[in-house]
């Protein structure tokens, strides 16, 4: 492949990413990696943040994949306060989950809350807001028959 060509699609962590976007913004296409984590990964690996993802060499893409794998194991040099799962419920370790692993873990957490009948679990079961929002006028679904005034 010539140096001036840009790969239109790059596969990292089982996700097809847009090769025309700058590296940090392209990495946000992976579930569990936000813009701040994407910039942290680029700085950790010494990648040019202004480069397009499709312009990176295969070796650089491999390094990104390895760094994401290190994150999920908690072995990266990125500070643990940036991770999306600190003090895991089962293991007590700090880790950063991505992709299907993140979705599965969140679902297990919600199922655990439902099983122990915690307040948050009950709210999830009922399809109501979990974080204390008001429900008198918000989160209404479906049509209800209103009260008719006497004439």
Curated annotation (Swiss-Prot):
Residues 131-151 are annotated as: Disordered. Pfam families: Ribosomal_S13 (PF00416). The keyword Membrane does not apply. SUPFAM superfamilies: S13-like H2TH domain (SSF46946). Gene3D superfamilies: 1.10.8.50, 30s ribosomal protein s13, domain 2 (4.10.910.10). The keyword Ribosomal protein applies. Residues 133-151 have a biased composition (Basic residues). GO terms for molecular function: rRNA binding; structural constituent of ribosome. Keywords: Ribonucleoprotein, Ribosomal protein, RNA-binding, rRNA-binding. It comes from the Archaea. GO terms for cellular component: cytosol; small ribosomal subunit. One of its GO terms (biological process) is translation. PANTHER family: 30S RIBOSOMAL PROTEIN S13/40S RIBOSOMAL PROTEIN S18, SMALL RIBOSOMAL SUBUNIT PROTEIN US13. Belongs to the universal ribosomal protein uS13 family. Located at the top of the head of the 30S subunit, it contacts several helices of the 16S rRNA. In the 70S ribosome it contacts the 23S rRNA (bridge B1a) and protein L5 of the 50S subunit (bridge B1b), connecting the 2 subunits; these bridges are implicated in subunit movement. Part of the 30S ribosomal subunit. Forms a loose heterodimer with protein S19. Forms two bridges to the 50S subunit in the 70S ribosome. This is Small ribosomal subunit protein uS13.
């Amino acid at each position: 492949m010539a140096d001036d060509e840009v790969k239109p699609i790059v596969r990292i962590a089982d996700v097809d990413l847009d090769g025309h976007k700058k590296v940090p913004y392209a990495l946000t296409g992976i579930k569990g990696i936000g813009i701040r984590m994407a910039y942290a990964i680029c700085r950790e690996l010494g990648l040019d943040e202004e480069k397009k993802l499709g312009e990176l060499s295969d070796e650089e893409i491999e390094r990104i994949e390895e760094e994401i794998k290190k994150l999920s194991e908690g072995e990266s040099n990125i500070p643990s306060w940036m991770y999306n799962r600190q003090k895991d419920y089962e293991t007590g370790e700090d880790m950063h989950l991505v992709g299907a692993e993140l979705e599965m873990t969140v679902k297990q957490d919600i199922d655990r809350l439902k099983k122990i009948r915690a307040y948050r679990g009950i709210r999830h079961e009922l399809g109501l807001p979990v974080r204390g929002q008001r429900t008198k006028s918000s989160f209404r679904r479906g049509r209800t028959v209103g009260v008719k005034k006497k004439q």
